[in-house]
């Protein structure tokens, strides 16, 4: 007695554990999970993060740039001091200096200045002497290697709108990234909805196949009793056996299809294929048509509009390349040892850069303008395509609603027919095969009905995706 209780307790524990660890997922939960874990969504999110960082970087592109410039330079030939170029100035200056010195000394001694004649003689004599001894060559500076280092600051003052356009382009690229992320989430939600509908369809068909198999098994048992009573021949019992075997095979196939459908759903959700997931929801037999709305929220159109904004900003940048650039510059040299020419340690100034001739400029402008026109055409084409798809989806919903209602009537009639054939068999007015045929027809009408429901709910999910609201399908599917 104790052992039986223990076995029962273990069995109950295992059943409860299986229930706890096998999660029941709703469509809304599946969509939320996929939008967090799906690789396509993650990739779009990473792209958006990159654009956010680039946008943040462009906010500082108007600040000055500070660079450390340092270099070791080796000159191929020694530097030469060009004394011949400054000879006249040196000779003239030295002669004048000699006259000034002699005149100063004479004035201090005598109190009078030298006569102009004497000054001229001193000037000419000094000039002749200096000219005679002045080198007639350019002397070399033996040091040929130099190390220089300093800080250079460059502050943009006017760049012809390049900075503003650059920030605007980065902002448009950020918006494109946001739109692309939303587009990725929309297509993921749509794919999840389609796969979830497929799982619900298989749940419904598995239930109907189980009911059909149960009826086939009862029919087989009834045929066995009739055979034992020698009321029917053996071949009619064989028909019942074959029908039951086919029913079992169909059930196994449906169960395997559901398992594969769950694998696909897990992959779309970005979770492990080994994670236990169970979905027992069946197709909603309601075919309520939603209020029809415009397609202005379509993600593809929004993405193309963002691309057009990028193209327009790119055109502004291309045009700004023909405008001048003005910078404030500063340079501080803190390491300039052994330079042959003594230069100031720092300088400040303005730098103007203006490309006066660029043979590619006109072609680039035309290409940028063409890109904007191309974006307009793509938006127009996509808008027409979306409008057409929306109208077709609306008509499909109406048509499939009517079709499913017709198939619903047919399957109910098939139920009545099966029941009548079974009663006739019980009264020996029909055969076992007649019942099997009626059950098969009943199953086929069920399949047609649920296939029409799948088509309707698929069209409904497609309609919401086209109009830019794919998650609205959760209002019609649990």
Locate the predicted segments by residue.
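Amphipathic alpha-helical coiled-coil scaffold segments and their short linker/junction regions
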Residues: 31-37, 87-134, 271-328, 473-478
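Short segments within alpha-helical structural elements
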Residues: 246-271, 412-469
